[in-house]
């Protein structure tokens, strides 16, 4: 079974997603150190909890920036140290809160030769890929309904990504309802 969240709630140290060989989380940082320490425990204490944001991008191959505050307004600040060091960086959705921040991150990545990527995990979730492939076997559909993650920006982004991952990018019309 695949789960949207990668740990069982009652057993947070039990991973439910397949592990990637040769990949290891070695450093963590959070403005609230206790949260980084808790995350380190989930990985059996292997990741070092860094005291400063700047330290988390030292001697690593990739920086992963999670959806920290939900709207991406902190992503420029969080990505800058690693990008300046030329470290490949993945930024969870949304990429940035403003177009100005997005351009700044792109310029930093380009200037320092740092690969930069952002997406919603809904685009690549194994169950979504399986459903999309099976949907194609039926000849497609004329109508689809996606129940999303609410009205916060992160929830809307997941809904859009799930819709495109399922039905493709040729969607002709969308109706959004809230309440």
How does the language model describe each region?
Residues 51, 91, 120, 175-178:
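Short loop/edge segments at beta-strand edges and connector loops
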Residues 29, 142-179:
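Rossmann-like dinucleotide-binding domain that binds NAD(P)(H)
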Residues 1, 30-31, 67-68, 147-149:
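Structural motif
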Residues 1-42, 122, 136:
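N-terminal Rossmann-like dinucleotide-binding module
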Residues 90, 95-156:
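A contiguous active-site-proximal alpha/beta segment in oxidoreductase catalytic domains
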Residues 32, 42-106:
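Beta-loop-alpha module in the N-terminal Rossmann-like domain of NAD(P)-dependent dehydrogenases
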Residues 24, 48-49, 115, 173:
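Conserved beta-strand segments of alpha/beta enzyme cores
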């Amino acid at each position: 079974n695949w789960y949207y969240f990668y740990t069982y709630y009652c057993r947070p140290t039990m991973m439910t997603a397949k592990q990637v060989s040769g990949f290891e989380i070695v450093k963590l940082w959070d403005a609230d150190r206790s949260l980084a320490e808790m995350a380190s425990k989930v990985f059996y204490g292997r990741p070092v909890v860094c005291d400063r944001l700047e330290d988390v991008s030292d001697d690593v191959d990739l920086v992963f920036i999670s959806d920290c505050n939900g709207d991406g307004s902190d992503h420029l600040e969080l990505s800058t140290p690693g990008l300046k060091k030329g470290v490949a960086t993945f930024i969870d959705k949304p990429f940035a809160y403003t177009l100005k921040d997005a351009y700044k991150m792109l310029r930093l990545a380009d200037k320092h030769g740092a690969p930069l990527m952002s997406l919603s995990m809904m685009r690549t979730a194994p169950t979504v890929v399986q459903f999309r492939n099976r949907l194609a076997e039926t000849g497609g559909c004329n109508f689809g309904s996606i129940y999303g993650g609410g009205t916060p920006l992160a929830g809307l982004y997941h809904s859009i990504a799930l819709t495109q991952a399922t039905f493709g990018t040729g969607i002709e019309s969308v109706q959004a309802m809230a309440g």
